[in-house]
Amino acid sequence: MPKLWDAVAGFAVTFGTLFKKPITEEYPEKPGPVAPRYHGRHQLNRYPDGLEKCIGCELCAWACPADAIYVEGDDNTADERYSPGERYGRVYQINYLRCIGCGLCIEACPTRALTMTNDYEMADDNRADLIWGKDKLLAPLQDGMLAPPHPMAPGATDDDYYLGRIGPVTEDVR
C-alpha cells in the first residue's frame, strides 16, 4: 500500500499544476523586457557629425580576457579622415564565439567608442557569421551625420570632439 500512495502523491503535484496558468514565455513571438544595464552586443559609436570615435588604440583588445577582439589601427590622412585625431580603427572584429560579455573592453576604451547595446539576438547557424566586422558593429548614421571619410568640422580640434563640442552637420556644410 505505501508504494501506491507514493505514486498517487507524485501525481498530485502533476494534477495540481494542470489547472494553473502556464509560466512559459512566448519568447520568439513576444520578446520580454531587457534590463537597462544588460550587456548585449557591442556597438562602435560615432560623433554627431558621423566621424567614428574609435582611434585604433587596441586597448579593448588588450583588456579582453577571452581574446575575442581584433583591432588594426591606421593613420588618418588629409584626404581620408575617419575619426578626429591621427589614427582610426581600420579593421575591427569581435568574435562572438569567444566573447564572454564581461564588458572589460568597454571600461578600457578611452574615447567611449565601444559600448554594449540591449540587443541579445545574435544566434546563428554558421560559425563564420559570428565574427562581426566593423560593418556590423558601427552605429547607424543618424540625421545630421555624414558617412566617413570626411574632414573634421571647420575650425574644430581633436579636443572639441573629445569634449562634446561638436554637433550634427548642417545643410550648408553638406
From Swiss-Prot:
What Gene Ontology molecular-function terms does this entry list? 4 iron, 4 sulfur cluster binding; iron ion binding; NADH:ubiquinone reductase (non-electrogenic) activity; quinone binding
Q: How is the cofactor bound?
A: Binds 2 [4Fe-4S] clusters per subunit.
Which source organism? Mycobacterium sp. (strain JLS)
* E.C. designation(s): 7.1.1.-
Q: Name one GO cellular component term.
A: plasma membrane
Q: How does it assemble?
A: NDH-1 is composed of 14 different subunits. Subunits NuoA, H, J, K, L, M, N constitute the membrane sector of the complex.
Q: Which coarse location class applies to the principal site listed for this UniProt protein?
A: membrane
- Pfam families for this protein: Fer4_7
NCBIfam families in the record: NuoI, PRK05888.1-3
Protein's gene: nuoI
Keyword RNA-binding attributed: no
Q: Where is the 4Fe-4S ferredoxin-type domain?
A: 44-74, 90-119
Binding annotation for [4Fe-4S] cluster 2: 64, 99, 102, 105
Lipid bilayer topology: Peripheral membrane protein
Which amino acid positions bind [4Fe-4S] cluster 1, per UniProt? 54, 57, 60, 109
The protein's name is NADH-quinone oxidoreductase subunit I
Q: Which GO terms describe its biological process?
A: aerobic respiration
Catalytic EC class: translocase
> Which InterPro entries does the record cross-reference, listed alphabetically?
4Fe4S_Fe-S-bd, 4Fe4S_Fe_S_CS, NADH_quinone_OxRdtase_chainI
Free-text function comment from the UniProt entry:
NDH-1 shuttles electrons from NADH, via FMN and iron-sulfur (Fe-S) centers, to quinones in the respiratory chain. The immediate electron acceptor for the enzyme in this species is believed to be menaquinone. Couples the redox reaction to proton translocation (for every two electrons transferred, four hydrogen ions are translocated across the cytoplasmic membrane), and thus conserves the redox energy in a proton gradient.
Annotated catalysed reactions:
a quinone + NADH + 5 H(+)(in) = a quinol + NAD(+) + 4 H(+)(out)
Keywords from the UniProt entry: 4Fe-4S, Cell membrane, Iron, Iron-sulfur, Membrane, Metal-binding, NAD, Quinone, Repeat, Translocase
Needed cofactors, names only, are: [4Fe-4S] cluster
Where is this gene product found? Cell membrane
